C-alpha cells in the first residue's frame, strides 16, 4: 500500500530495543531501585548469585523488564518462562540442568500458577541447588540427584495471596511494584519517542500519561496509537492538541476511562439507582463475565474513587455521578 503525506520520522526499533538495560534507564519505582542497587552491589562484592527475588504487583508495571535489567546489571544470562509452562518436574529439571550456568537468572512469570508437583521440586533447587528426579516406574524406579548451578530465581505474580507459604519463605527478597505517576509515565513515553525517532511535546506525553491507569504498558500502547494518528495526519510533531484528538478517538476520557468502564457506571447509575447491586446481577445486565468485571474493570474504577465494593454490592460514588454528568442522589450516598 502506497503511503503519502507522512512526515513523522520513523525508525524501526523492536520492543527488545526499547527495553531499558540498566536501573538508571528504568523509569519509576525509585524506592525499589534504591534497594536493588544495594542488593546487586552486595552480591557482586561477595561474588555470589543474587538471593531469590519475588516481585509482585498489578500487571503491566514492568516486572519482566526489571528481571532483564537485573540480569544485565549482574552480567549474567536470563532464562524466561512462566508457571503454566512448567507442567511437570521434568520440565523444571530440563530448564535448571540444561539452560542455566553459574549465577544465571531463571525468571518465572505467573509463578503462582506452578503445579504443586513442580513447586515441591523447586524447593530443594532453591535451597540447596539440587533436584531429585525419579527414573522409571514401579519396583525398578530409582532416584537420580541432579547437581544444579548456583542460580537466582526471580518470580513474578499479580496475585501474591496465591503463593504458598513454603514457596514464599524461600525467597530472600520480596518486593512490591507500585503504580506510576503521570509524570513518570510521560517520561516513559518521551524515552520511547526518542528511540523511535518520533517528536512529541512534553505536554502531549503528559496527557498520555494521565490516561494510562498508572501502568507503563498502557502508556506505551497509547503512545503507539497516538503516533499512528499523528503519522497518518502528516504531523511533524505530536502536540498536546493532536494527542487529545487521538485519545478521544480511542474512546478515552480525561480519567483514562474506556467506553466499557463508562458503561459499567452508567448501568449501575441508570438501571440500579447507583446500587448497591451484586456482582453477578451487574455482570448479567452488562452481558459481561463476572471475572472480567471484577479483575479487569473494577480495580481502576475503585482506585479512581468511582466505585465502591460493599457487603451489599457495588455502589457508584458521587464522583461517578459527576464525572458522567448525572446529578448525584439527594441526601447521603447509598453506602458510606
UniProtKB/Swiss-Prot annotation:
Binding site residues for DNA: 309, 314
Catalytic activity: ATP + H2O = ADP + phosphate + H(+)
A Pfam family it matches: RuvB_C
Binding-site positions, Mg(2+): 64
Enzyme Commission code: 3.6.4.-
Quaternary structure and partners: Homohexamer. Forms an RuvA(8)-RuvB(12)-Holliday junction (HJ) complex. HJ DNA is sandwiched between 2 RuvA tetramers; dsDNA enters through RuvA and exits via RuvB. An RuvB hexamer assembles on each DNA strand where it exits the tetramer. Each RuvB hexamer is contacted by two RuvA subunits (via domain III) on 2 adjacent RuvB subunits; this complex drives branch migration. In the full resolvosome a probable DNA-RuvA(4)-RuvB(12)-RuvC(2) complex forms which resolves the HJ.
Protein name, as recorded: Holliday junction branch migration complex subunit RuvB
Organism: Thermus thermophilus (strain ATCC BAA-163 / DSM 7039 / HB27)
Gene assigned in the entry: ruvB
Amino acid at each position: 500500500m502506497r503511503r503519502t503525506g507522512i512526515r513523522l520520522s520513523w525508525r524501526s526499533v523492536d520492543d527488545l530495543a526499547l527495553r531499558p538495560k540498566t536501573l538508571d534507564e528504568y523509569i519509576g519505582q525509585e524506592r525499589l531501585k534504591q534497594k536493588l542497587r544495594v542488593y546487586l552491589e552486595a552480591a557482586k562484592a561477595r561474588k555470589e548469585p543474587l538471593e531469590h527475588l519475588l516481585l509482585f504487583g498489578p500487571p503491566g508495571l514492568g516486572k519482566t523488564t526489571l528481571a532483564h535489567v537485573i540480569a544485565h546489571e549482574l552480567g549474567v544470562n536470563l532464562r524466561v518462562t512462566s508457571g503454566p509452562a512448567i507442567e511437570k518436574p521434568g520440565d523444571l529439571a530440563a530448564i535448571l540442568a540444561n539452560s542455566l550456568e553459574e549465577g544465571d537468572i531463571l525468571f518465572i512469570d505467573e509463578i503462582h500458577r506452578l503445579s504443586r508437583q513442580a513447586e515441591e521440586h523447586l524447593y530443594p533447587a532453591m535451597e540447596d541447588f539440587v533436584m531429585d528426579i525419579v527414573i522409571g516406574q514401579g519396583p525398578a524406579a530409582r532416584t537420580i540427584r541432579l547437581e544444579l548451578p548456583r542460580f537466582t530465581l526471580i518470580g513474578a505474580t499479580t496475585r501474591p495471596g496465591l503463593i504458598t507459604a513454603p514457596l514464599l519463605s524461600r525467597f530472600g527478597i520480596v518486593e512490591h511494584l507500585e503504580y506510576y505517576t503521570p509524570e513518570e509515565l510521560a517520561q516513559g513515553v518521551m524515552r520511547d519517542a526518542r528511540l523511535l525517532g518520533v517528536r512529541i511535546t512534553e505536554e502531549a506525553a503528559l496527557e498520555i500519561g494521565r490516561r494510562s491507569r498508572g501502568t507503563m504498558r498502557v502508556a506505551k500502547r497509547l503512545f503507539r496509537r497516538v503516533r499512528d494518528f499523528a503519522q497518518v495526519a502528516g504531523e511533524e510533531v505530536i502536540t498536546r492538541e493532536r494527542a487529545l484528538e487521538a485519545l478521544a478517538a480511542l474512546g478515552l476520557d480525561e480519567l483514562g476511562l474506556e467506553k466499557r468502564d463508562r458503561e459499567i457506571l452508567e448501568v449501575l447509575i441508570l438501571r440500579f439507582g447507583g446500587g448497591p447491586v451484586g456482582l453477578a446481577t451487574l455482570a448479567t445486565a452488562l452481558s459481561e463475565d463476572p471475572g472480567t468485571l471484577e479483575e479487569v474493570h473494577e480495580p481502576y474504577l475503585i482506585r479512581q474513587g468511582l466505585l465502591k465494593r460493599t457487603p451489599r454490592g457495588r455502589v457508584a460514588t458521587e464522583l461517578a455521578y459527576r464525572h458522567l454528568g448525572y446529578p448525584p442522589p439527594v441526601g447521603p450516598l447509598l453506602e458510606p
